[in-house]
């Protein structure tokens, strides 16, 4: 159930180039039961920046009432968020959207989790949930270069983990699909989050597989009211049928929406 709450900053640190790990605490965490959902953060008091910033939920610790977000500080809003210190309060709205269907993976099956860039974080909570129910997980994490690689060791604690960098400075040179080809990776179910180009490549390969993708789109309200994040359905690509990423998604079955 969505709630609005002022949450306390437990810790914030830069873990890779311009990539920040922010831990917040509050009872809102008790509502975070679906990996792949996101929160809307009011990065500062006042009216500038005006819009809240959508950030995916990376890790949930309901015993401590804490959750972790990872984000890239690149625009005015996220750069402001990166200045927030331990003990400060941050206005949080969430959890929002529909996440990854953990129930679609069965114990004993193999799940392939593919993340690209800042699309990697929500896969961490998902991976933990899958492992807890007896699913074997394989992770492929794609980044531009070594300086922006994060959470490789944390994912490796949960299952086989491969990294690809576009420039070849770490792991496999190239894209996540190169890792799949190089290692002949097979799986029963696919979960993915990342850039549209990556999601399109996966969709082209795995239309017949059980697969779910999380879309990264710029969102305004986060609750389906402003229509800033609509996408067409593949069954009606030029018509009036659409889905809203923020409220109908951000997770969709592969092949449902136009990428």
Swiss-Prot record:
Q: Which cofactor does it need?
A: [2Fe-2S] cluster; FAD
- UniProt KW Nucleus keyword: no
| A Pfam family | DHODB_Fe-S_bind
Cofactor stoichiometry and binding? Binds 1 [2Fe-2S] cluster per subunit.
Which UniProt key words apply to this protein?
2Fe-2S, Electron transport, FAD, Flavoprotein, Iron, Iron-sulfur, Metal-binding, Pyrimidine biosynthesis, Transport
List each copy of the FAD-binding FR-type domain by range.
Answer: 2-102
Keyword match Glycoprotein:
no
The record ties this protein, via InterPro entries, to: Cbr1-like_FAD-bd_dom (IPR008333), Cyt_c3_hydrogenase_gsu (IPR012165), Dihydroorotate_DH_ele_sf (IPR037117), Dihydroorotate_DH_Fe-S-bd (IPR019480), Dihydroorotate_DHASE_ETsu (IPR023455), FAD-bd_FR_type (IPR017927), FNR_nucleotide-bd (IPR039261), OxRdtase_FAD/NAD-bd (IPR001433)
Molecular function in Gene Ontology: 2 iron, 2 sulfur cluster binding; electron transfer activity; flavin adenine dinucleotide binding; metal ion binding; oxidoreductase activity
Residues annotated as binding [2Fe-2S] cluster: 221, 226, 229, 246
Source domain of life is: Bacteria
Which GO annotations describe the biological process of this protein? 'de novo' UMP biosynthetic process
- Where FAD binds, per the record, is at 53-56, 70-72, 77-78
Q: So, what pathway does this thing act in? A: Pyrimidine metabolism; UMP biosynthesis via de novo pathway; orotate from (S)-dihydroorotate (NAD(+) route): step 1/1
Family note = Belongs to the PyrK family.
HAMAP family in the cross-refs: DHODB_Fe_S_bind (MF_01211)
Q: How does it assemble?
A: Heterotetramer of 2 PyrK and 2 PyrD type B subunits.
Name the job this protein performs.
Responsible for channeling the electrons from the oxidation of dihydroorotate from the FMN redox center in the PyrD type B subunit to the ultimate electron acceptor NAD(+).
Protein name, as recorded: Dihydroorotate dehydrogenase B (NAD(+)), electron transfer subunit
What is the organism field in this record? Bacillus cereus (strain G9842)
Q: What is the lineage of its organism?
A: Bacteria, Bacillati, Bacillota, Bacilli, Bacillales
């Amino acid at each position: 159930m969505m709630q609005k709450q002022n949450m306390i900053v437990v810790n914030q640190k830069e873990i890779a180039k311009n990539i920040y790990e922010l831990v917040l605490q509050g009872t809102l965490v008790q509502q975070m039961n679906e990996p792949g959902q996101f929160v809307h953060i009011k990065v500062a008091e006042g009216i500038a920046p005006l819009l809240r910033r959508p950030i995916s939920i990376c890790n949930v610790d309901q015993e401590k009432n804490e959750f972790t977000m990872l984000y890239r500080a690149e625009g005015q809003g996220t750069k402001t968020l990166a200045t927030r210190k331990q003990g400060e309060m941050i206005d949080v709205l969430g959890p929002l959207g529909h996440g990854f269907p953990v129930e679609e993976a069965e114990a004993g099956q193999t799940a392939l989790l593919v993340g690209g860039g800042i699309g990697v974080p929500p896969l961490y909570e998902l991976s933990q949930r899958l492992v807890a129910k007896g699913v074997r997980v394989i992770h492929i994490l794609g980044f531009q270069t070594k300086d922006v690689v994060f959470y490789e060791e944390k994912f490796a604690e949960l299952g086989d983990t491969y990294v690809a960098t576009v420039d070849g400075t770490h792991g496999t040179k190239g894209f996540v699909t190169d890792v799949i080809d190089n290692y002949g990776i097979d799986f029963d179910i696919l979960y993915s989050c990342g850039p549209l180009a990556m999601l399109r490549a996966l969709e082209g390969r795995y239309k017949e597989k059980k697969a779910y993708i999380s879309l990264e789109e710029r969102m305004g309200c986060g609750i389906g009211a402003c229509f800033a994040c609509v996408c067409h359905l593949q069954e009606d690509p030029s018509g009036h049928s659409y889905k809203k990423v923020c409220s109908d998604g951000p997770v969709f079955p592969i092949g449902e929406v136009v990428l």
